[in-house]
Amino acid sequence: MKTLKIFIGILLLLISCTSQAKKIGIIEMRCENQDNPLGVQSDSPIFAWKLEADARNINQSAYQILVADNPELLKKGIGNIWDSGKCTSDESLNIAYAGKPLNSAACYYWKVKVWDSRGIESSWTEIKNFRMGLLEQEDWTPAKWIAMETVPQKDLVYPGFQLAGNKVNPLDKEARMPQFRKAFQLDKKKVLSAVAFISGLGHFELSVNGTKTGDHFLDPGWSKYDKSSLYVTFDITEQLRNGENVLGVRLGNGFLHIPRDSTRYRKLISTFAFPKMICKVRVTFTDGTTKDIDSGNDWKVTPSPTTFSSIYGGEDYDATLEQVGWQLPGFDVTAWNNATEIPTVGYLSSQTSSPMKIKQQFKSISINETQPGIYIYDFGQNASAIIDLKIKGKNGAKVIMKPAEYLTDDGLANQNNSGHPYWFSYTLSGNGTEHWQPSFSYYGFRYVQVEGAVPAGVKNPKGLPVIEDLKLLHVSNASKPVGKFTCSNQMFNDIYSLIDWSIKSNMSHVLTDCPHREKLGWLEVAHLMSSSIAFGYDIKQMYTKTIEDMKNSQLENGLIPNTAPEYADFPHDFRDSPEWGSSGVILPWFLYKWYGDISVLRNSYKLMVSYVDYLTSRTKYHILYHGLGDWYDLGPNHPGYSQLTTRGLTPTAMYYYDLNVVAATSKLLGKESDYERYTNLAAKVKIAFNAKFFTKEKGYYDCGSQTANAISLYMNLVNDEDRESCLKQIIADIRTRENSITAGDIGFSYLLRVLEMEGASDVIYDMNSQSDKPGYGYQLKQGATSLTESWAALKTASHNHCMLGHLMEWFYGGIGGIRTDKESVAFKKFIIHPEVVGDFHSADVAFNSPYGEIRSKWEVKDQKFIYKVTVPVNTKAFIYLPTMKQENITEGGKPMNDVQDIRYLGTDKERSIYEVGSGEYNFIIAP
């Protein structure tokens, strides 16, 4: 009997160990690329998840999704809204909902389980939810757009004018910033949920019973307000109470209206309307009944303490105008007016892009009185930001705070090239310590010049207000970070930080060019920096919004303006440059390849085709001659228009690339006639391009610039027999210039990609490891903490631009070696090809791809190459190890011939190539 018990115990232990070794788990469940999203606008939302396993080479073989309108049903295994059944598929991304019709404003719950390639079934996941938005415009009824005051028709201006001067009439009366109030009663019924659907233009802050709702900044996102506006969805269940409740809404101008006050900075003048709002709150009770609170002329309105609001000029707040308790029940509103109902303009859609938020705070590293009564706070980092002020002083005292990227020779705030004059001002109420943050404007800065107050601890004979604390609050788009990079070379770590700060500072509601002077969505950066940004941040939602902005800004003739949303009708090439407008073609394709969502191509096809047809109409014998060219290349003159490359070359190369992208999209979508048309047209453009720009006896394009040759190679415009000579010309030009960069905004991205692609990362290293010539190292030496607009860090240009940050892509794709596979999407299959260059002896690079984390960590130690690779579950990688000798390689301590789950594919360019499935791999290459 004792022997039997021992036997059974051993058997149970073996069974337990076996089951533990065969597990598949589900992590990072997402609906519409978000965790528990609010305001889902699609009637067929997409689901996704990532997998984890405790064995290598594991894939998904099937999945099942359940969706219910009650979480209790899901607990019982019932999907009364959708039960997908067991679907044989290895797809874990972009699974489209296919159940019963979804209702506006309704909340749904979902869970999923999977089977892996061994037949092992996972447990059901935890329950997640998604809240639908208002799917149809009539779902807003009876809510109305309301305002405090309206703009006379004669004063509406959109798109606006840059440096408008006398093009725009002065306003009879400038917009005042309103605050709205709505009180409502909730009886004794128990509240199940309460959701607010709200748009306040230009920007709004919502409060419920005196508490701000959410942690967003500058809601809603920017849009082309004559075509569309965005609304935001908030769950306010926990903010409500029995009895009287109060909704409070404050509005600022944003891009809806640029004040015409000539004493403050204005990049442009435009007026779509004065601030306005619309709101619907739906309260659902446990008995199934609902109550809606809708905006209308029964809402109360009065001017707010925000006395000036400009996205370009700053923000003023007068605390003496505060009405204490206005957001709380019981407040007397007899002195307030009824809101004015106004007509609807454009359509409303949900803000599904990530909002802006306060992401990081900085304390001052020094405070100096550079002139009597003027104090400079240095926060040590140039960033897109607002200030956070704590101050104490007398009623009516006023403090002015001027942000700046750098200082004048006299030690004062220098805004000459970042948009001036810009300031924040605060007028004190005199009620103890006062705390204020701007709500409706931000700037790019490192320094703040303070006038009218003194720092705590400073002698104060005039009795000025005392600043108890002043911080810099970095504001940015809340897109999820997905990348990490560190290496043994400190200069390159600093360059990574330099570029990353410029990316974060320009990830706003659009990808801006700079966070101060313009704050506009100049489109060339969006496609040229796409991979550089996407390695660091999940930008699927942000870029999907950019595509919508381009659709709403596209002209009837197909032209996509250089900026989207288009707020100003810039002249000539500044409105119509193919290197910029091509984002309308390239971004949908990029999103499909990076994130695997083919619906982006379907939804963008008209945008793409209309634009290439427009470009075709502008050609002369298949060549384009308009545009800005290789903007800010490094030539003999002050940077601006292309200096070293004929301006017809880059737009024609871009046009050729666009044609090929549209052709590939046409084929993918089954549009065969379009595929043939654009393929044939591309072939004609290639012939014309080479006839126009290629000098065969010299082996280069145009005048032989880095940009001309690199973009021609990357776009496959170079004939096969000429590729080698063209590459040699690029490298020769770089070496002749002592490894100097000349390529600009358009060309540098393609220069790096071509050099990496052709195995010349040593050249990339040499170009970017020096500090005595204009480039990244030079900018660091000049004291830059974010990437500057010009290679030479000119003080006549912005010091926070991400348009030249393309080296970020090489950090991941070169040093880390993480590269997309041309035949795959969303990193389902990918390449790992690490580059050991210069004085690098280690690097650790990680990227949380759509399927999971890819990690490439290597070290050269004692002449050995020690390499750790992580491949996500449900994916495959092709690893290029830097040796031709298989016998010198071990994995997990075993010779490669003894490793059964790794497939040897051969060699290429002194590399051994292996195909691996998911899991962790530990390689050592002996000398």
Question: Positions of the model-derived regions?
Answer:
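Non-catalytic C-terminal accessory modules of carbohydrate-active enzymes
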Residues: 269, 273-282, 292-330, 349-361, ...
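Alpha-helical support elements that line or immediately flank enzyme active sites
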Residues: 194-198, 208, 386-405, 440, ...
